Amino acid sequence: MARNRICGKWENEAKTLRIQISTQGNDFIAKIIWFSDTEGKPMNYWKDKRNPNPKLRNRTILGMSILRDLKYNDKKGTWEDGIVYDSRHGKEWNASANINKKGQLKVRGYWHFKWIGKSMIFNRLK
C-alpha cells in the first residue's frame, strides 16, 4: 500500500540518527532508535532537558517520538500536517515528508510556511 511506504527504519545522511516510522491509527509517527554520541555516554543518558514542559525533561531521547500526526495525502503521494520535535532546542515545528525518486525520505520541518524551514534526508535501512 502506497501510504505505508514511509514505514520502516531510516538513517539520516550524516549517519548520526536512526528513526523508525510506524502507524498510529491513521497517522504516522517516528521514534528515535539510535543516535551518535560524541561524548561517549550511553544513549539512555541523554534526556529531553530543553523541553518546554518541565514534566517531560527527564524522558530519555532514545525511544522518544520526534515526529507525529503525519497524514498521507493520496493525491500528492506525500505525508502532511505533522509535527516534528527538535529536542536540541525544545521546539515543535510543522512537518511534511515525501519519498524522492532515489527512494530517500525527505522530512521538512517548517514554521507555518514550507519555504521557511529545514529538511533532513534519510536513507532506508535494510
Task: List each language-model region with its residue ranges.
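N-terminal helix-cap/turn-to-beta initiation motif at the start of protein domains
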Residues: 1-9
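Residue-level detector of short, conserved catalytic/binding motifs and their immediate flanks
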Residues: 8, 28, 105, 120
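Edge beta-strand at a domain terminus
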Residues: 102-104, 111-126
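A mature extracytoplasmic/lumenal domain signature
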Residues: 14, 23-25, 34, 99, ...
